């Protein structure tokens, strides 16, 4: 695979916390989240994820997985506890800085979220344009990332002309085009057949090998068992297992 450039930094500085080793990507410290009216989604959740890790977050529906993602994206605030992403304490982050935080993250969702009236290349280019990239940079980066995901030959195809797996590859390309240090994946294989899912996971594994940290929420038992990566398991809002080379369920 062609060597990829180092992740780009955010254009403006954000509040940082001390990390002498510089090796930490995500920290949850005793995080609690209570939704109105008095519905507890997370209780006392603590974990640390280092840069370059590939981590699965598993658990039944309602276990708190989606809340973890929403907290990481600062869509919601924790009721108690502290969250650090890339050395930045999200509790100290002003609202005006949140777009800068999200610009330094990549997100991949189950339902692709592609613009239906745009080609694969235009979907990726649009995301770059929103982030303020020049036309020259867009012309350079879009073909490179489409080649990475194996869709250089489909750059002028619209979503309706692509299979589900191809649409997800475009979604991954859009999320990774600026080489973010952290890629957050919410059920990226949830709408795909098993064979297509394998290809998507192989692609995510290749991206992880470049140094990008990947946090992936999934219900795919077979995939988690096969890959033997770190597994964080949630149950009724509590962290019940954190295993370095785990399966979907405790062995």
What kind of feature is each model-predicted range?
Residues 73:
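Helix-to-loop junction immediately C-terminal to a conserved catalytic motif
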Residues 183-186:
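Catalytic Walker B motif of ABC-type/P-loop ATPase nucleotide-binding domains
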Residues 81-89:
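Conserved ABC transporter NBD signature motif
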Residues 177-181:
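A short, proline-enriched helix->beta-strand linker immediately N-terminal to the Walker B motif
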Residues 118-125:
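Short coil-to-helix segment of the ABC ATPase nucleotide-binding domain corresponding to the Q-loop/switch region
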Residues 36, 90-106, 135, 207-209:
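ABC ATPase NBD coupling module
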Residues 158-162, 166:
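Conserved ABC ATPase signature
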């Amino acid at each position: 695979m062609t060597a990829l450039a180092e992740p780009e930094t955010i254009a403006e500085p954000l509040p940082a916390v001390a990390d002498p080793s510089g090796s930490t990507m995500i920290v949850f410290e005793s995080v609690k989240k209570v939704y109105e009216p008095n519905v507890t989604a997370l209780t006392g959740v603590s974990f640390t994820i280092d840069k370059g890790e590939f981590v699965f977050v598993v658990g039944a529906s309602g276990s708190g997985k989606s809340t973890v993602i929403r907290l990481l994206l600062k869509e919601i605030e924790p009721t108690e506890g502290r969250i650090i992403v890339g050395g930045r304490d999200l509790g100290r982050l002003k609202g005006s800085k949140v777009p800068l935080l999200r610009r330094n993250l990549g997100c991949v969702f189950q339902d692709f979220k592609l613009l239906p009236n745009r080609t694969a290349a235009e979907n990726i280019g649009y995301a770059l344009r929103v982030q303020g990239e020049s036309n020259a940079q867009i012309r350079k980066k879009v073909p490179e990332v489409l080649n990475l995901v194996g869709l250089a030959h489909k750059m002028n195809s619209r979503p309706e002309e692509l299979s589900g797996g191809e649409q997800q590859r475009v979604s991954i390309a859009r999320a990774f085009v600026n080489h973010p240090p952290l890629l957050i994946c919410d059920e990226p294989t949830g709408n795909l057949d098993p064979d297509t899912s394998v290809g998507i996971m192989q692609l995510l594994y290749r991206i992880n090998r470049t140094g990008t940290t990947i946090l992936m929420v999934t219900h795919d038992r077979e995939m988690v068992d096969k890959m033997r990566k770190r597994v964080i398991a949630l149950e009724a809002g509590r962290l019940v297992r954190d295993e370095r080379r785990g399966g979907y369920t405790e062995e």
